[in-house]
Amino acid sequence: SIICSDKTGTLTQNKMTVEDYYVAGKRIPVSELDLDDPAQRFLMDYSILCNDSTNENGVEIGDPTETALINLASQHGLAAASIRNLYPREGELPFDSDRKMMSTLHRIDGKNRMIVKGAVDRLLELTEQIWTHDGIREITEADKIKIQQQNQSFSMEGLRVLAFTYR
C-alpha cells in the first residue's frame, strides 16, 4: 500500500496534504476514499498508528508528512486518538535514514502486529505478500514492477511517496 502527499506549500508553509492512495492495485484520489472498503480503512488506520504526529484542536505537532495523514483521517471522521487508544503502541523503531523506515508494534485482534512505514523500494525488499481485490496472496515480481512503476509515476508528478506494510 502506498500513500502520496502533495508537495505544494511544503516550502512556503511547511504543510502537506495527502493527494492519492494506491491500494489493492488501484490509484485512488483522496476525494474518492471509501472507508467502508476494508483495504482502504486498513491503510488509513495503519497510517495513524505508525505515526508520531498529532492535531489537537487545530494545533499540528510533528512532521508535515505525518500530520497530513492525521489530517486526512480527521477529514473522514476518524479521530487519531481513538484509533491509537484502541490499538496502543507497545514498541517502536523510530525512523532511521539508514533503514529508510519507521516501525511500530501494536496488539491488534489478539496478535502482535508490526506496522512499517517507509521508502517504497526498501519495503518492497521486505514484502512477501500483497493485498489485492481478491484478498491476500504471495507478491509476485510483476506486482513489484507495477508498484515500482506507480511509485515512479507519483514521483514524476512531484508527490512524496510512502509505503506501508505489516507483519
Go through each PLM region and give its residues.
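Conserved cytosolic headpiece of P-type ATPases
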Residues: 1-167
